[in-house]
Amino acid sequence: MLVLSRKLNQSIQIGDDIEVKIISIEGDQVKIGIEAPKHIDIHRKEVYLSIQEENNRAASLSVDLLSQLSSQKK
């Protein structure tokens, strides 16, 4: 993991298209702004993990449903 220090209003550039900027620092909370192309999904980590879990659950249900439907046709 690359660890960088930034101060208020400083940025980090990721590739050509993504900029992460420190917007404010209040106590132990840091607000960041992210500029990125619209086709790039940006989520908080806990939201991303929840989405992945839900997708895995849905995919599993789909496989089970397809198996059930397939066995009913036979």
UniProtKB/Swiss-Prot annotation:
Alphabetized, the UniProt keywords read:
Bacterial flagellum biogenesis, Cytoplasm, Repressor, RNA-binding, Translation regulation
Localization per record = Cytoplasm
Locate the transmembrane regions by residue number. Answer: none
Q: Name one GO molecular function term.
A: mRNA 5'-UTR binding
What S-S linkages are listed for this chain? Answer: none
The main location is cytoplasm
One CC-aspect GO term:
cytosol
| One GO BP | regulation of bacterial-type flagellum assembly
Task: Spell out the InterPro entries in the cross-references.
Answer: CsrA, CsrA_sf
The domain of life for this entry's organism is Bacteria
Alphabetized HAMAP family for the sequence: CsrA
Q: Which family does it belong to?
A: Belongs to the CsrA/RsmA family.
Oligomeric form and interacting partners: Homodimer; the beta-strands of each monomer intercalate to form a hydrophobic core, while the alpha-helices form wings that extend away from the core.
What is the role of this chain? A translational regulator that binds mRNA to regulate translation initiation and/or mRNA stability. Usually binds in the 5'-UTR at or near the Shine-Dalgarno sequence preventing ribosome-binding, thus repressing translation. Its main target seems to be the major flagellin gene, while its function is anatagonized by FliW.
Can you say what this protein is called? Translational regulator CsrA
Gene source species: Bacillus pumilus (strain SAFR-032)
Tell me the gene name.
csrA
